[in-house]
Amino acid sequence: MTKLIVICGATATGKSGLALNLAMRLGSVILSADSRQVYREFDIGTAKPTLAEQKAVPHYLIDICTPRETMTVADYQEQAQALINSLPVSPLLLVGGTGLYIRSIVQGMKIPRVAPNYELRSQLESLGQTTLYGILQQVDPVAAQKIHPHDPVRTLRAVEVFYVTGIPISAQQGENPPDYPILQIGLDCEMERLSERIHKRTEQMIADGLVGEVEYLCQKYGADLPLLNTLGYQEIKQYLAGEISLEAAKELIVLHTRQFAKRQRTWFRAYPQIEWFNADDADLLDIVWQRIQQ
């Protein structure tokens, strides 16, 4: 019997809604695989499940960190795997769009437990991406072959791990896939439709109070909080600073979300184990339900 059902895909494809309905049918629970929903108080801009939704179906790995704490992929993997091993429910639903979180579970990634060194990161970032990638090619050519030259996040992390440990990150990584059955379900739709979904969701976030949420978080934690420089928050922060209009902020959120969604689609499409379903299918719930019953 399948122990874990993964529901993944780009942002705004309806993963959470599908998961909620499936969990209620299965009498199951949801494990979030979203790198921002782990943080408390970051609610509207992360499309975090509402309190009513969390009451209807138990959700885990949501609101487990303060905004000033750091949740690494290794931290997430450890906590998620502990829940998978201990929760007396089967199948569990692992739901989200953070590819590394999902990959850490379904492929059993071996991840170096190296805490972020922010002073070192600041020094490395000041070198610029081109120079930093050149350093990576020198100290860890194996990792450089797997990391795109224009991927600053993974480039920085790989160089950071080398400088902290003296060992290339590629030599510290590997995979130990779990021995339990996993069904991976991906949701996707035409890019034009996805753009419409993103626009609609952005408008809903504004209506739900995103501006007030960002204003509150800036006052409580300071506008330089790293999380406030992420998608949906950085644009509203610009609006609150008087740099752009609210309409311009919304347009930027839509643009940046579309760009993010394209990267997510590329990431997930690289994994042949994922079975894809049309997010716009009127009978999506029943179609996926039939697949689960097979």
UniProtKB/Swiss-Prot annotation:
Residues binding substrate are: 11-16
Q: Name one GO biological process term.
A: tRNA modification
The answer to whether the entry has keyword rRNA-binding is no
* Pfam name, any one: IPPT
What keywords were assigned to this record?
A: ATP-binding, Magnesium, Nucleotide-binding, Transferase, tRNA processing
Residues involved in ATP binding:
9-16
**Which residues are listed under the site Interaction with substrate tRNA?**
98
What this protein needs as a cofactor is: Mg(2+)
Single GO term (MF)? tRNA dimethylallyltransferase activity
Q: What class of enzyme is it?
A: transferase
Which SUPFAM superfamilies would you find in this protein's record? P-loop containing nucleoside triphosphate hydrolases
Reaction catalysis annotation: adenosine(37) in tRNA + dimethylallyl diphosphate = N(6)-dimethylallyladenosine(37) in tRNA + diphosphate
What superkingdom does the record give?
Bacteria
* E.C. no: 2.5.1.75
InterPro entries associated with the record = Dimethylallyltransferase, IPT, P-loop_NTPase
List the residue ranges of the region (Interaction with substrate tRNA). Answer: 34-37
Q: What does this protein do?
A: Catalyzes the transfer of a dimethylallyl group onto the adenine at position 37 in tRNAs that read codons beginning with uridine, leading to the formation of N6-(dimethylallyl)adenosine (i(6)A).
The record's similarity note reads: Belongs to the IPP transferase family.
NCBIfam families registered for this protein in UniProt: miaA
Q: How does it assemble?
A: Monomer.
Protein name according to UniProt: tRNA dimethylallyltransferase
Q: Say which species the protein is native to.
A: Trichormus variabilis (strain ATCC 29413 / PCC 7937) (Anabaena variabilis)
The record's gene field reads miaA
